[in-house]
Amino acid sequence: MPYSVLLMRKLLLVAIVLTTAGLATPWRGSAQTTRVSNSPPIVSAADAPAGTEKLAVQWLRISVPDLGVMLAAVARPSGPGPFPVVVVLHGTHGFAQEYVRWAQDLARGGFLAVAPCWFSGGSESGSHAVTPPIPCPQLPPLKRDAYPEAVQYIDAVVTAARALPGARADRLGIVGHSRGGGETLQYLLAIGNVQAAVLHSTGHGYRPVTRVAEFNVPMLILHGTADGPANGGSVNTQVALARDFEAALRQNQKSVEAHYYEGGGHNTFFTNSTQREDELKTMIAFLRRYLGA
């Protein structure tokens, strides 16, 4: 079955389910018209963006017909492979160099790690915690409620990552920070063909707690107890929402682990080396359990 037809069917099914469920504010983006590419993403080599030349990664262009061109950094472990794959999705502050280094840290843990610029630009909220976004001029910004487009961009990255040389196509996880985590949850419901997900300071604007019975992917929740608007987050990233989601997953006997960092803000991972090291250790151990390495 052609890639575009399969993706359209999956997204249409999710839209039907969400509409008939009668949810009030969550998931309203699902009612938007879905644009589907006529072919799989086209992957080609790219030059290192200005200012990133010293980062020891491979740069790729991931072209998604009708949507734009994503830039992605690929960090590889040493050795011949094949390796399990991890995709790292940035938050609203943009595709900062910190995400490339995050991918490098995961590669040292034994994973073929892909950090894409999956939407361009970046908001001022939380920008103090990271370097300015790496430019992605051939990719538009992502609207606030761009449900279909977000899922399509993530699916294009996942599809491209699975096809990389040395990748284990049957073992792939997603790590999403803030909006990256929130849209990962959307992706899990719409497509769901991954083996693990790390929800990092994740936004719960779509209230995924209302659909916990439909999640079938092992999840790791990493969240600071002080996360909120005062430190780069929002009302949708407050820790109470993460705790409610965890509790609902457990009540539905879903596979979930959670670590809460006392006093940690929305972006403390990027500013506190002690917390960062602990989070990396925790997520690598989790990913190894479900992906191998």
Predicted regions and their residues:
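Alpha/beta-hydrolase
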Residues: 89, 116, 200, 261-264
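Short beta-strand/loop motif that positions the catalytic acidic residue
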Residues: 215, 221-223
